[in-house]
């Protein structure tokens, strides 16, 4: 009889058991979320939390939302991920969260206008691949 379910209680057990190749993904996640890139870390955490919420992974949503709040030093208990349009975040980040939603729901639904709404705030086009990468990482982690 397999002891699989007892052995793998969390994603971390899976990573540790297969560290020779899983370590690369862990390092990728660390670089993606923590290295200075086009997006501030709190927005990357917010994207991760938003996608996790859309995917029904409350564990990841709650953790990444709290990290984002702490990075913002925001004492506001309101959840900006519930209503992006009226969220108390800078306007330039709202199109990024909207684009992240489309990446998660149906990447083929993304139109030039969606990208233009992000780029109009002076972001480099590389920010689009960064958004897609964060969404992909969240999707993977939400299903492991």
Which residues make up each language-model segment?
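Preference for long, well-ordered alpha-helical segments
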Residues: 127-144
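Mobile cap/lid helix-loop segments that border enzyme active or cofactor-binding sites
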Residues: 1-45, 66-69, 76
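Acidic interhelical loop/turn segments
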Residues: 109-131
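Short acidic alpha-helix initiation/capping motifs at coil-to-helix transition points
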Residues: 20-27, 58-60, 104-113
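Short, thiol/selenol-centered motifs that function as redox-active sites or metal-ligating centers
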Residues: 47-71, 134-138
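Alpha-helical scaffold segments that form or flank carboxylate-/histidine-based iron centers
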Residues: 7-14, 41-56, 85, 125-132
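Amphipathic, charged-and-aliphatic alpha-helical interface segments
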Residues: 49, 91-110, 132-135
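Helix-adjacent hinge/juxtasegments
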Residues: 59-62, 66-93
